[in-house]
Amino acid sequence: MPEVPWVEKYRPRRLSEIINQEDAISKVKAWIEAWLHGNPPKKKALLLAGPPGSGKTTTVYALAREYNFEVIELNASDERTYDKIARYVQAAYTMDILGKRRKIIFLDEADNIEPSGAPEIAKLIDRARNPIIMAANHYWEVPKEIRDRAELVEYKRLTQRDVINALVRILKREGITVPKEVLVEIAKRASGDLRAAINDLQTVVAGGYEDARYVLAYRDVEKTVFQALGLVFASDNAKRAKLAMMNLDMSPDEFLLWIDENIPHMYLKPEEMARAYEAISKADIYLGRAQRTGNYSLWRYAIDMMTAGVAVAGTKKRGFAKFYPPNTLKMLAESKEERSTRNSIIKKIMSEMHMSKLEAIETMKIIKTIFEKNLDLAAHFTVFLGLSEKEVEFLAGRENAGTIWGKALAIRRKLKKEEEKIRKERKEEEKVEVREEKPEEKVEEKREERETKKEKEKKEEKKAEKKGKQVTLFDFIKK
């Protein structure tokens, strides 16, 4: 019988057991008690917002247990269209007439609700007769119509100490001892995500090593993808296979492609091969959900399926195993390069021709036809848009790209010569202007000198006259 995940085994059953979220829990209790007292709050939906692993989902189920509610859960990532979501949310409009228990409609990952369905869901919230609780990692990504109708309760990121204390309690209940440095390392890697930390702890303990320090040392050894594949395909031990992703410098979705490529080369029987492919298909589902929701703690489940699930699928070939790189990676790399070149051309068209993106995309189609049919005009477009050799090849194809590029270089050289010629002519004109300006400046200076001299002479004459008058008056008084 497979071991129960510790995340579920040790999930808090009561609100008081939730770690370091006292303010949030207090608001949630006040809100739900308003419903129980027959006085529903003005905002009939509650939005729990905070980082992954902070206790949002746990709060909903602990609340339901304490206040005797039935939880109807749906996930916005899986049920995105309004028609699908509405079937569940419609339950909020009526009481559960046949049963005694009231309902809580729990909408997880509300930040993934499609905007097109948000207005109708908002209407259903307005007329709800049962409480609706939503959870989201990113508050501002929840559609505005829903944010406006929901009371916000913020969950804070757990500290490293909070995470370590929770792990210690689990180890005590399991009767297991793990060195403190191991717990510190796990808490650091979790970044406040308690769910991820508990999954990591269970993985470390399940490694089967008496000394957990060995597992940490194993993390520090850099492995190639071929060594990681060896752990998956050369072992029938699920616990050992799960170590394959430790410290591998590759994301799980990339490693999945390598495993997928090598399954046919490793398994002997079709039914065993089918079991291996079933395991990686489940892993792919978890990876897809992690990508859509940003809840990367789901990677743990994906890694378990793609490593341990594949390892125990059947009998592998014995002896030397040659591993093959996935063709998918090559195709994705090529298509990525093409997309990058295409986007670069579109940006240049938008900039040089002052177009919107949609107009630029349509214009690029016309330009591509020109590049295939009229090489001379294509060369002029190359210069005008400032296209690179790779971009010319994208538009014209390899066969014509060389010719167009050569013509474009010739045009650029010609333009450069013209620019130099114009630059020289302008310099000559500037020199002539300077020479013409100098004589005028000298004449102007002489004129100013003459005027200054005249003014001085006039001043001196006035002084002399004044002096003459003063002498005459003095002489007159003396007489």
Curated annotation (Swiss-Prot):
Record: residues binding ATP: 50-57
One GO term of the biological process aspect: DNA replication
Q: Where is the composition biased (Basic and acidic residues)?
A: 420-468
Q: Where is this region: Disordered?
A: 420-479
Disulfide bond among the record's keywords?
Answer: no
Q: Which CDD domains does this one have?
A: AAA (cd00009), HLD_clamp_RFC (cd18140)
The alphabetical list of record keywords is: ATP-binding, DNA replication, Nucleotide-binding
Q: Which InterPro entries match?
A: AAA+_ATPase, ATPase_AAA_core, P-loop_NTPase, Rep_factor-C_lsu, RFC_lid
Please describe the quaternary structure of this protein. Heterohexamer composed of four small subunits (RfcS) and two large subunits (RfcL).
* Family stated for the protein in its record: Belongs to the activator 1 small subunits family. RfcL subfamily.
Q: Main role?
A: Part of the RFC clamp loader complex which loads the PCNA sliding clamp onto DNA. The complex possesses DNA-independent ATPase activity.
Under what name is this protein listed? Replication factor C large subunit
Q: Which organism is it from?
A: Pyrococcus abyssi (strain GE5 / Orsay)
Gene from which this protein is expressed: rfcL
